[in-house]
Amino acid sequence: MTNTSLEVIGYVRCDYKEKFGIPRQSGLTGCAAAFIEMLPPYNQAEAFRGLDEFSHIWLLWDFSRAHKNGFTATVKPPKLGGNQRMGVFATRSPFRPNNIGLSSVRLLDIIYNEENGCVHGLVVSGADILDGTPVYDIKPYLPYTDSHPEATGGWTDSLDIPELSVCSSDDITAKLETIFSSTQIEALKEILAQDPRPGYQDEPNRRYGMLYGGYDIRFTISDDTLTICEVAEPGPQ
Protein backbone atom coordinates (compact mmCIF):
# COMPACT_ATOMS: atom_id res chain seq x y z
CA MET A 1 0.00 0.00 0.00
CA THR A 2 1.30 3.44 -0.91
CA ASN A 3 1.03 6.04 1.81
CA THR A 4 0.60 9.69 1.02
CA SER A 5 0.34 12.88 3.03
CA LEU A 6 -2.03 15.81 2.80
CA GLU A 7 -1.22 19.42 3.54
CA VAL A 8 -3.44 21.28 5.99
CA ILE A 9 -4.31 24.60 4.36
CA GLY A 10 -6.50 25.99 7.13
CA TYR A 11 -8.75 25.35 10.11
CA VAL A 12 -12.48 25.66 10.72
CA ARG A 13 -13.62 28.12 13.39
CA CYS A 14 -17.28 27.80 14.36
CA ASP A 15 -19.78 27.34 17.20
CA TYR A 16 -19.78 23.51 17.08
CA LYS A 17 -17.51 22.49 19.95
CA GLU A 18 -18.31 18.77 20.11
CA LYS A 19 -19.63 16.09 17.76
CA PHE A 20 -23.08 15.81 19.36
CA GLY A 21 -25.41 18.35 17.77
CA ILE A 22 -23.45 19.01 14.59
CA PRO A 23 -25.74 18.94 11.53
CA ARG A 24 -25.57 15.51 9.95
CA GLN A 25 -25.05 16.94 6.49
CA SER A 26 -23.91 20.25 5.06
CA GLY A 27 -26.55 22.72 3.94
CA LEU A 28 -29.11 21.74 6.57
CA THR A 29 -28.52 24.87 8.64
CA GLY A 30 -28.42 27.88 6.38
CA CYS A 31 -27.97 30.35 9.23
CA ALA A 32 -24.94 28.67 10.80
CA ALA A 33 -21.80 30.58 9.81
CA ALA A 34 -18.23 29.29 10.00
CA PHE A 35 -14.83 30.80 9.31
CA ILE A 36 -12.10 28.98 7.39
CA GLU A 37 -8.84 30.37 8.75
CA MET A 38 -6.17 30.07 6.06
CA LEU A 39 -2.53 29.18 6.71
CA PRO A 40 0.55 30.33 4.77
CA PRO A 41 1.60 29.80 2.06
CA TYR A 42 -1.95 28.86 1.00
CA ASN A 43 -3.31 32.27 2.01
CA GLN A 44 -1.82 34.10 -0.96
CA ALA A 45 -4.44 36.32 -2.56
CA GLU A 46 -3.57 34.96 -6.01
CA ALA A 47 -4.78 31.51 -4.97
CA PHE A 48 -8.30 32.91 -4.50
CA ARG A 49 -8.51 34.93 -7.71
CA GLY A 50 -11.97 34.35 -9.22
CA LEU A 51 -13.38 32.46 -6.22
CA ASP A 52 -15.62 35.37 -5.23
CA GLU A 53 -17.65 34.76 -8.40
CA PHE A 54 -18.93 31.44 -7.02
CA SER A 55 -21.85 31.20 -4.59
CA HIS A 56 -20.87 27.80 -3.18
CA ILE A 57 -17.65 25.87 -2.60
CA TRP A 58 -16.57 22.36 -1.66
CA LEU A 59 -14.50 21.82 1.47
CA LEU A 60 -12.33 18.73 1.89
CA TRP A 61 -11.43 18.21 5.51
CA ASP A 62 -10.25 15.77 8.16
CA PHE A 63 -12.51 13.82 10.54
CA SER A 64 -9.86 14.67 13.12
CA ARG A 65 -11.78 13.24 16.08
CA ALA A 66 -12.76 9.99 14.41
CA HIS A 67 -9.37 8.43 13.68
CA LYS A 68 -9.01 4.76 14.58
CA ASN A 69 -6.84 1.85 13.54
CA GLY A 70 -8.10 -0.87 11.26
CA PHE A 71 -10.79 -1.08 8.61
CA THR A 72 -14.45 -1.82 9.32
CA ALA A 73 -16.46 -2.71 6.23
CA THR A 74 -19.89 -1.91 7.70
CA VAL A 75 -21.22 0.78 10.02
CA LYS A 76 -24.47 1.51 11.83
CA PRO A 77 -25.93 4.82 10.56
CA PRO A 78 -27.59 6.70 13.47
CA LYS A 79 -30.52 7.58 11.21
CA LEU A 80 -31.36 3.88 10.94
CA GLY A 81 -31.73 3.61 14.70
CA GLY A 82 -28.23 2.31 15.27
CA ASN A 83 -29.25 -1.33 14.72
CA GLN A 84 -28.89 -1.76 10.95
CA ARG A 85 -25.59 -2.09 9.16
CA MET A 86 -24.66 -0.57 5.82
CA GLY A 87 -21.46 -0.74 3.84
CA VAL A 88 -19.15 2.09 4.82
CA PHE A 89 -19.03 3.25 1.18
CA ALA A 90 -22.84 3.53 1.16
CA THR A 91 -22.74 5.97 4.09
CA ARG A 92 -21.08 9.19 5.13
CA SER A 93 -19.76 7.73 8.36
CA PRO A 94 -16.58 9.41 9.67
CA PHE A 95 -15.05 5.97 10.26
CA ARG A 96 -13.53 5.44 6.83
CA PRO A 97 -10.31 4.05 5.33
CA ASN A 98 -9.24 7.68 4.98
CA ASN A 99 -10.89 10.09 7.38
CA ILE A 100 -11.79 12.68 4.74
CA GLY A 101 -14.97 14.72 4.87
CA LEU A 102 -16.61 16.54 1.97
CA SER A 103 -19.03 19.44 2.44
CA SER A 104 -20.71 21.89 0.08
CA VAL A 105 -21.18 25.29 1.72
CA ARG A 106 -22.27 28.76 0.70
CA LEU A 107 -19.43 31.25 0.31
CA LEU A 108 -20.42 34.48 2.06
CA ASP A 109 -17.20 36.48 2.05
CA ILE A 110 -13.44 36.41 1.58
CA ILE A 111 -11.61 38.30 4.33
CA TYR A 112 -8.26 39.86 3.45
CA ASN A 113 -5.47 40.91 5.81
CA GLU A 114 -5.13 44.67 5.45
CA GLU A 115 -1.44 44.61 6.38
CA ASN A 116 -0.10 42.10 3.86
CA GLY A 117 -2.97 41.58 1.43
CA CYS A 118 -3.13 37.86 2.11
CA VAL A 119 -6.41 36.04 2.69
CA HIS A 120 -7.19 35.75 6.38
CA GLY A 121 -10.05 33.37 5.74
CA LEU A 122 -13.42 32.55 4.20
CA VAL A 123 -16.83 33.12 5.75
CA VAL A 124 -19.21 30.29 4.85
CA SER A 125 -22.62 29.01 5.91
CA GLY A 126 -24.18 25.57 6.04
CA ALA A 127 -21.09 23.75 7.30
CA ASP A 128 -21.38 20.46 9.19
CA ILE A 129 -17.86 20.59 10.62
CA LEU A 130 -16.43 20.69 14.13
CA ASP A 131 -14.53 23.72 15.44
CA GLY A 132 -10.78 23.26 14.94
CA THR A 133 -11.13 20.81 12.05
CA PRO A 134 -8.18 20.80 9.60
CA VAL A 135 -9.09 21.70 6.01
CA TYR A 136 -7.25 20.04 3.11
CA ASP A 137 -8.68 21.73 0.05
CA ILE A 138 -11.20 24.19 -1.36
CA LYS A 139 -12.89 23.77 -4.73
CA PRO A 140 -15.64 25.77 -6.46
CA TYR A 141 -19.09 24.21 -6.66
CA LEU A 142 -20.08 23.92 -10.33
CA PRO A 143 -23.88 23.80 -10.80
CA TYR A 144 -23.70 22.47 -14.35
CA THR A 145 -21.86 19.33 -13.25
CA ASP A 146 -22.24 19.01 -9.46
CA SER A 147 -26.05 19.19 -9.38
CA HIS A 148 -27.94 16.02 -10.34
CA PRO A 149 -31.74 16.50 -10.07
CA GLU A 150 -32.34 12.93 -11.26
CA ALA A 151 -30.21 11.41 -8.49
CA THR A 152 -31.61 8.79 -6.11
CA GLY A 153 -30.61 8.58 -2.47
CA GLY A 154 -30.57 4.85 -1.80
CA TRP A 155 -31.55 3.91 1.74
CA THR A 156 -31.79 7.59 2.72
CA ASP A 157 -34.83 8.09 0.46
CA SER A 158 -37.02 6.26 2.98
CA LEU A 159 -35.87 8.24 6.00
CA ASP A 160 -38.34 10.30 7.99
CA ILE A 161 -36.60 13.66 8.37
CA PRO A 162 -37.70 15.19 11.70
CA GLU A 163 -38.81 18.77 12.07
CA LEU A 164 -39.30 19.56 15.73
CA SER A 165 -40.88 22.67 17.16
CA VAL A 166 -38.27 24.46 19.32
CA CYS A 167 -39.46 26.47 22.30
CA SER A 168 -38.12 27.98 25.52
CA SER A 169 -39.37 29.97 28.49
CA ASP A 170 -39.18 33.76 28.52
CA ASP A 171 -36.21 33.58 30.92
CA ILE A 172 -34.29 31.14 28.74
CA THR A 173 -35.09 33.17 25.62
CA ALA A 174 -33.81 36.33 27.31
CA LYS A 175 -30.61 34.55 28.37
CA LEU A 176 -30.01 33.30 24.85
CA GLU A 177 -30.43 36.84 23.54
CA THR A 178 -27.82 38.18 25.96
CA ILE A 179 -25.26 35.54 24.94
CA PHE A 180 -25.75 34.98 21.22
CA SER A 181 -26.49 37.08 18.17
CA SER A 182 -29.85 36.69 16.45
CA THR A 183 -28.16 34.73 13.66
CA GLN A 184 -26.54 32.35 16.17
CA ILE A 185 -29.90 31.79 17.87
CA GLU A 186 -31.58 31.06 14.56
CA ALA A 187 -28.81 28.61 13.68
CA LEU A 188 -29.17 26.91 17.07
CA LYS A 189 -32.90 26.49 16.52
CA GLU A 190 -32.26 25.03 13.06
CA ILE A 191 -29.91 22.46 14.56
CA LEU A 192 -32.28 21.50 17.37
CA ALA A 193 -35.28 21.29 15.04
CA GLN A 194 -33.54 18.45 13.20
CA ASP A 195 -33.41 16.36 16.41
CA PRO A 196 -29.70 15.88 17.20
CA ARG A 197 -30.31 12.65 19.12
CA PRO A 198 -29.21 9.30 17.67
CA GLY A 199 -32.14 7.45 16.12
CA TYR A 200 -32.12 4.83 18.88
CA GLN A 201 -32.64 7.37 21.69
CA ASP A 202 -36.25 8.32 22.39
CA GLU A 203 -36.62 8.99 26.11
CA PRO A 204 -39.19 11.75 26.78
CA ASN A 205 -37.96 12.45 30.32
CA ARG A 206 -34.27 12.53 29.48
CA ARG A 207 -32.37 15.82 29.50
CA TYR A 208 -29.85 16.16 26.68
CA GLY A 209 -27.02 18.64 26.32
CA MET A 210 -24.86 19.98 23.51
CA LEU A 211 -22.02 22.49 23.43
CA TYR A 212 -22.76 25.45 21.22
CA GLY A 213 -20.75 28.65 21.08
CA GLY A 214 -19.00 27.78 24.33
CA TYR A 215 -22.22 27.14 26.28
CA ASP A 216 -24.00 23.98 27.36
CA ILE A 217 -27.47 23.97 25.81
CA ARG A 218 -29.71 21.52 27.66
CA PHE A 219 -33.07 20.39 26.36
CA THR A 220 -35.82 17.81 26.51
CA ILE A 221 -37.94 16.34 23.71
CA SER A 222 -41.53 15.23 23.99
CA ASP A 223 -43.47 14.18 20.90
CA ASP A 224 -42.64 16.80 18.26
CA THR A 225 -41.57 19.55 20.67
CA LEU A 226 -38.05 20.33 21.84
CA THR A 227 -37.81 22.56 24.90
CA ILE A 228 -34.59 24.38 25.79
CA CYS A 229 -34.53 24.17 29.58
CA GLU A 230 -31.09 25.48 30.52
CA VAL A 231 -28.19 27.50 29.13
CA ALA A 232 -25.05 27.13 31.23
CA GLU A 233 -21.33 27.61 31.02
CA PRO A 234 -19.68 24.20 30.59
CA GLY A 235 -18.06 22.65 33.62
CA PRO A 236 -14.35 21.79 33.88
CA GLN A 237 -13.17 19.18 31.40
Tell what function each PLM region has:
Residues 2-8, 95-105, 213:
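Short coil-to-beta-strand transition motifs
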Residues 49-101, 200-204:
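Active-site-adjacent substructure of cysteine-protease-like catalytic cores
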Residues 13, 105-108:
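Conserved positions in beta-strands of structured domains
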